[in-house]
Structures are given as structure tokens and as C-alpha cells.
Design a protein with these regions (language model features):
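Signal for well-folded cores of large energy- and translation-related assemblies
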Residues: 1, 27-30, 34, 38, ...
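Canonical AAA+ ATPase core
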Residues: 1-66, 108-110
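Solvent-exposed, flexible loop/coil residues
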Residues: 8-10, 15-17, 37, 95, ...
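Short amphipathic alpha-helical patches
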Residues: 18, 46, 61-64, 101-109, ...
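Generic alpha-helical secondary structure signal
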Residues: 35, 52-57, 72-76, 122, ...
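Conserved AAA+ ATPase small/helical "lid" subdomain
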Residues: 56-119, 123
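C-terminal engagement/docking regions of AAA+ P-loop ATPases
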Residues: 112-174
Length: 174
């Protein structure tokens, strides 16, 4: 108590601080935390945002804007697709909120590079595979049948089939 040790170095630390750390449970660091450490920590488990509206607030607050508007209905649609992937039975490592932020930023970058002031449905479509494929991991039963790129593309085609208004309206009025 009152000391921190790293390797052979020990440092006296007053006990008037709060330590906050993060860890993804599916990937441990170089060493798992010992029982001694675990006994000194409170652990809070956090899942994905419970609603699309909450996730949208996080994405807009944390994402870069490039002064390019992202229509609200279009962002909702993109987040609906991410949430669909999170619930997919063949995905072992689910797309995180960072993936949602990545879609937001990449879609805006696509519009910006095309010299437009607003994101279109095509900007979102063009962003999905490059943003999502490397952020998810398919279960062994699925990853030997198709690549993550093909999987995301196929799931998006299925999603579009179930939401025909997306392409018909260019993402408007979903």
C-alpha cells in the first residue's frame, strides 16, 4: 500500500488519487491483472450505446466535421447498419463506436473531396467496407467462407434490400 512497483523500481505514492483505466475484455494485455490488483479495483462493464440517438450524439461530438453537413436521417441509417452488424451471429469482434465515428468522418471526407457541402448516400456506401471490414472479426465458421470485405458488402446489400428508401431517396427521408 502506498507504493507502485514497475519491474525493480518502486515509487512511494500518496493514496490521494483515483486511477481510471480501460481494457477490452476480448483482448488482454501482455499480462492479465493479478488477484492482488483486482482486489483493489472496482470494475464497471460498459456495453455499446443503448439507443441510436445516444450513439449519434457520441459520433457527432467526437467526429471531425470538415465543415461538411451529415444529414440526420442518413447518419441514423448508417448507425442502423452498424448496430445490425453488432447483432450478427457470424461476427466475433463487433464494430465499436469508433467504427461509427469512422463512417461519419470517412463519409464527410468523401463529400469534401468531391467538393460537396453535404454527405450523400453514395459517400456513406463508399465508406462502409474500408471503415468496417478491418474493425470486425468473423467467427471461424464464417471467416473461411468469405473475407471481411465481402461479408460487409453482402450484409449491406441485404440491408439495402430491406430498406429500399435509402437508394431511391438518396438517403433523404428514411
Amino acid at each position: 500500500e502506498g507504493k507502485a512497483t514497475l519491474g525493480s523500481y518502486s515509487v512511494d505514492l500518496p493514496a490521494n488519487f483515483i486511477f481510471i483505466g480501460t481494457m477490452n475484455p476480448e483482448t488482454s494485455a501482455t499480462e492479465k491483472l493479478s488477484d492482488v490488483f483486482l482486489d483493489r479495483f472496482d470494475i464497471i462493464h460498459m456495453g455499446y450505446p443503448e439507443t441510436i440517438e445516444l450513439e449519434k450524439q457520441i459520433v457527432v461530438a467526437k467526429g471531425q466535421t470538415l465543415q461538411v453537413a451529415f444529414p440526420d436521417d442518413l447518419l441514423t441509417f448508417a448507425l442502423m447498419f452498424v448496430r445490425l452488424l453488432r447483432d450478427h451471429k457470424d461476427i466475433q469482434k463487433k464494430p465499436s463506436v469508433r467504427a461509427s465515428i469512422g463512417i461519419y468522418e470517412r463519409s464527410q471526407a468523401n463529400a469534401f473531396l468531391s467538393k460537396r457541402k453535404s454527405v450523400t448516400a453514395q459517400d456513406v456506401t463508399d465508406a462502409l467496407i474500408s471503415v468496417l471490414a478491418h474493425r470486425l472479426e468473423l467467427k471461424p465458421s464464417a471467416k473461411y467462407l468469405q473475407s471481411a470485405d465481402d461479408f460487409v458488402g453482402e450484409q449491406f446489400k441485404n440491408f439495402l434490400r430491406d430498406h429500399p428508401d435509402f437508394e431511391e431517396n438518396g438517403g433523404e427521408g428514411l
